[in-house]
């Protein structure tokens, strides 16, 4: 077990190619965002209490360790031949029932699901001998914007609890180290348990968000034609960071309604919509080849920008854009800052811009000002980069970064990233 305190950080995600086509068994590609969720784990002054704080959603709840239903849940925990917690494919109904009863009384759904995820993972990865601890989550990701904030949180919790339970080793790689592309047991363990955490939030998630948050880089995924067959997933851990502008239109959307709309188009104009979906498939496959190039550089980035523009046009043809998203694209194109497309389901939500290599910062700021004047929120971030990592207090001279009061009181996302982000703190470790 690592000495407390420590901080875990995991990225969010955006889908860069293949939205909507993925529903029809076509490949899609998601990539990590440099915006992250951060989890501070520190010892509690009360050895009998575990406390979970999530200031960004105004959650602050404590439990007496002895009051948690350890004995009721124990019969339903299983272990593999190495005596490690066995990872179920689904939530265990009996554990769900016990925790649901235990958490009865939460009126705020977001608070309920966060506590449910936390306790489900805690009681599977630790035991009743656990000491009192404080867990504080901060997010530089917009919450509820389809950018994987719940998966990032789940990955942070799974990593911390697995490390404290002694189920994984401490990471040792630094930011600029080349990552192993082979299967890494510790990351596989984190990924699978974080999917269980995601199921606590969402019921039946695809597993893509937590995979990107765990492994970083980018992931190509493809659903199979039958539920019995596992989806195809290819991790691109060493996909390099590319400058990105993320713009949240703040327009609410219904993913289910947008998917249903494409379904109706497909039923009415099958040959046309099939051609569009096939074009998106070919586009995603081309993007994958470009992204896997070991000599990836400016030329390959330019190709991705061209594919971004094509993909947006195809999504417009499917009817899933929105005037706000088109406004983002028009403003971006007017300032010539890069290639812009909607990301995710569309119908509102977010757009991404792959920023041109030679664009001046003042031009980007002018575009951002115009986005803000339209009521949107923009984030200068990057695409790709590292997955889950840990910052250990013994590696850092500045103890204030592990101060609970400072961690809770960062005033905004910029303050969090300035203090903890990998751009400024080089002591982060990765698997």
Swiss-Prot record:
One of its GO terms (molecular function) is metal ion binding. ATP binds at residues 13, 139, 144-150. It is an enzyme of class 2 (transferase). Pathway: Isoprenoid biosynthesis; isopentenyl diphosphate biosynthesis via mevalonate pathway; isopentenyl diphosphate from (R)-mevalonate: step 1/3. Transmembrane segments: none annotated. Induction: Expression is up-regulated in response to terbinafine. PANTHER family: MEVALONATE KINASE. This is Mevalonate kinase. It comes from Candida albicans (strain SC5314 / ATCC MYA-2876) (Yeast).
């Amino acid at each position: 077990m690592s000495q407390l305190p420590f901080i875990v950080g995991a990225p969010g995600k955006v889908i860069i190619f293949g939205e909507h086509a993925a529903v029809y068994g076509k490949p899609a590609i998601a990539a990590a965002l440099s915006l992250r969720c951060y989890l501070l784990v520190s010892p509690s002054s009360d050895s009998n209490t575990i406390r979970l704080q999530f200031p960004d959603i105004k959650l602050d709840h404590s439990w007496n360790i002895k009051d948690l239903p350890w004995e009721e849940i124990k019969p339903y925990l299983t272990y593999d031949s190495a005596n490690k917690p066995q990872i179920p494919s689904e939530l265990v109904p009996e554990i769900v029932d016990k925790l649901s009863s235990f958490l009865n009384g939460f009126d705020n759904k977001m608070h309920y699901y966060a506590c449910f995820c936390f306790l489900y993972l805690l009681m599977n990865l630790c035991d009743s001998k656990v000491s009192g601890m404080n867990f504080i989550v901060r997010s530089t990701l917009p919450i509820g914007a389809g950018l994987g904030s719940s998966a990032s949180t789940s990955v942070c919790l799974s990593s911390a609890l697995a490390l404290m339970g002694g189920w994984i080793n401490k990471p040792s790689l630094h930011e600029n180290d080349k990552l192993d592309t082979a299967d890494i047991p510790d990351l596989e363990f984190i990924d699978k348990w974080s999917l269980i955490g995601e199921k606590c939030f969402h019921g039946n998630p695809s597993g893509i968000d937590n995979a990107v948050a765990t492994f970083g880089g980018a992931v190509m995924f493809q659903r199979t034609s039958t539920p019995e067959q596992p989806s195809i997933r290819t991790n691109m851990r060493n996909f390099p960071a590319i400058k990105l502008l993320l713009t949240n239109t703040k327009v609410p959307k219904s993913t289910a309604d947008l998917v249903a709309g494409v379904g109706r188009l497909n039923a009415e104009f099958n040959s046309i919509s099939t051609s569009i979906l096939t074009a998106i498939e070919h586009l995603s496959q081309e993007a994958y080849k470009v992204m896997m190039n070991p000599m990836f550089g400016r030329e390959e980035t330019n190709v991705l920008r061209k594919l971004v523009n094509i993909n947006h046009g195809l999504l417009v043809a499917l009817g899933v854009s929105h005037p706000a998203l088109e406004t983002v694209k028009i403003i971006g194109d007017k300032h010539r800052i890069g290639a812009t497309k909607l990301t995710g389901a569309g119908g509102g939500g977010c757009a991404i811009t792959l920023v041109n290599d030679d664009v001046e910062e003042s031009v980007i700021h002018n575009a951002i000002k115009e986005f803000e004047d339209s009521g949107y929120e923009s984030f200068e971030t990057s695409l790709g980069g590292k997955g889950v990592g840990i910052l250990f207090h013994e590696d850092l001279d500045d103890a204030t970064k592990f101060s609970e009061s400072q961690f809770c009181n960062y005033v905004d996302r910029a303050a969090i990233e300035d203090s903890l982000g990998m751009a400024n703190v080089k002591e982060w470790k990765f698997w």
